[in-house]
Structures are given as C-alpha cells and as structure tokens.
Regions:
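Short alpha-helix
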Residues: 190-206
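Conserved SAM-binding loop of SAM-dependent methyltransferases across substrates and taxa
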Residues: 73-84
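N-terminal accessory regions of S-adenosyl-L-methionine
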Residues: 1-51, 106, 178-180, 199, ...
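A short glycine-rich, Lys/Arg-flanked "PGG" loop and its adjoining helix->strand segment in the class I
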Residues: 146-161
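Conserved class I S-adenosyl-L-methionine
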Residues: 64-72
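Short, glycine-/aromatic-enriched active-site segment of Class I SAM-dependent methyltransferases
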Residues: 167-189
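A short acidic, Gly/Pro-enriched loop at the edge of an enzyme's catalytic core
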Residues: 123-133
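A short SAM/SAH-binding and catalytic strip from SAM-dependent methyltransferases
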Residues: 131-144
Length: 267
C-alpha cells in the first residue's frame, strides 16, 4: 500500500459482481481510490493527489503510532501503513464512512489499523500516546480552530508531529476569511486563514510550524463526480467558465500541508 490501496486474492467472477454491487450500496465514496481485485472504487477525490503532496514533506512514519482525525473511510490510514506505521487509529463519526472502512478492511484484514466512530472531543486517553497526528480537511470547519489544535497536541508525545492539511486564502483577506454562509458550496466553514494567519494561529496555541508544502489550487481533476459518488461535486461549487472563483465569489480553495510540533515548555 505504499503506492496505492490495492488488495488482490482469488475469487470467482460471481464474487466480483456481487462485491461491486454491495460496495455501491455504500455510496457516496468520498476518499479513494481502492482496488479490490478488478473492482475499482473510483471515489470523488483522487486522494492520491493529496497524499503525493504529503510525501513532499518526507515525514518519517516508520514504526510510528499514528492518529488520523476525521479520517473518512480510512484511505489515508492504509497509505500510512504503506509507509511503515506501527499502528493507525482513525476517528470518523460518519457511519457511512465507517461502514466503508469495515468493508475495505474485511478484504485487507489488517490488525494494524482500527477505526472508532467518534469525534476527537470524545476520546479519553490518559497520557499522550501518538507520535504523529493527522488532521486533514478539518480546521476550517472548526468554530474554534485554536481549540482543535490544542486538542490534537494533548494526545501528542513529546517531540511528536501534527500534520495539518487545510485550505488557505490569499493574503488579500489579511489573516482570515470568515464566510457569511457557504464557501465553495461547503456548509459550516467558519474561518479560512491566510498562510500568515495560519502561522499566527499555530503560535498562539504554544505550537511551532516546522515544515510546509506549497499551497495548491483544488481542481476538477482531483475532485469530481463518479459512479461511486454520483452527486454534485466540486465543479458545481465554481463559477461557470471561471475555475478560479467559487460560486460565492471567493478564490478557489488553495490547499496546503503544515507540520507542527509543541514548543519547548509549552502546553
């Protein structure tokens, strides 16, 4: 799973048709793709695009305990195992995504990855446990993004790493853009920070930014409707004929990774 999530084993053509029909009952498949023999789950997001951007950071996951918050169906968790993670715990309260994970791991049969249908705020761990914690596509959905960062840090081992993937806005909006309603047709987007605003937010929580990737514009090649997610997708969130503006008139989302750690003697 270092290059893709692909599972191969012996089965009959009848098994293939039955499996595809059953997996299609779990739409929408947001993250992927997955290959189970010849069954190709062509998800809405080509999530390997994002994972390739993460790989630019060259962050070592070998023999690490990893937490993936808001993990969706576990696609990235399986990719983390492909980089040698010792164990991965995924948190995902959406029961459709949870069911998709159970279906995939029914074939993968990995004991190194588990998923709880819980939010970060619900888990109780007495001591910091994780070497690396991922929060991807969550920060802008938080009413209190600073609290979210502090909760992540509370579960992080000393000298561990937090990986944030989020949307950033151009500096035209100064430190933060606060949509009055939707952003790129997404509800519950409470704040979108500029790169300067994001770094300031991180520092205010007693954390330190130590690495980042370039901010990359989301495209309709990366996120689109498919048989496995047959509803409105990213193209419907953009101005007709202008893929650099959303239907609300905002800049099209720019996504980037940042790696942060706890400052000395903080938290």
């Amino acid at each position: 799973m270092s290059s893709e999530v692909k599972i191969n084993f012996n089965w009959t053509p009848q098994d293939s048709h039955k499996t595809k029909d059953l997996l299609l009952q779990l739409v929408p498949w947001r993250k992927g793709p997955f290959s189970i023999n010849e069954v190709f789950i062509d998800s809405e997001w080509r999530s390997h695009f994002k994972w390739d951007r993460f790989l630019e950071l060259d962050l070592d996951l070998n023999d690490k305990t990893v937490l993936d918050v808001g993990s969706g169906n576990g696609y990235y968790g399986f990719r983390m195992l492909g980089l040698g993670a010792k164990e991965v715990l995924c948190l995902e309260p959406n029961l459709t995504h949870f069911s998709q994970f159970l279906a995939i791991n029914n074939f993968a049969k990995s004991k190194k990855i588990q998923m709880l249908p819980e939010r970060l705020e619900s888990i109780q761990i007495d001591t910091p446990y994780f070497d690396v914690i991922f929060s991807m596509g969550l920060l802008y959905h938080q009413r209190d993004p600073g609290k979210h960062l502090r909760l992540l840090a509370a579960h992080l081992k000393k000298e561990g790493r937090i990986v944030i993937e989020t949307i950033v806005t151009p500096e035209d909006y100064e430190e933060v853009l606060v949509p009055s309603d939707r952003y790129a047709n997404m509800p519950n987007v409470w704040s979108v920070h500029s790169e300067i605003g994001l770094e300031k937010l991180i520092l205010e929580q007693g954390l330190e930014l130590i690495d980042s990737t370039e901010a990359i514009m989301t495209t309709i090649e990366e996120q689109r409707a498919t048989q496995w997610m047959p509803f409105g997708s990213f193209e419907s969130a953009l101005e007709e004929g202008n893929h650099e503006r959303t239907i609300e008139g905002f800049p099209t989302p720019l996504r980037k990774f940042v790696v942060i750690t706890i400052q000395n003697n903080q938290l």
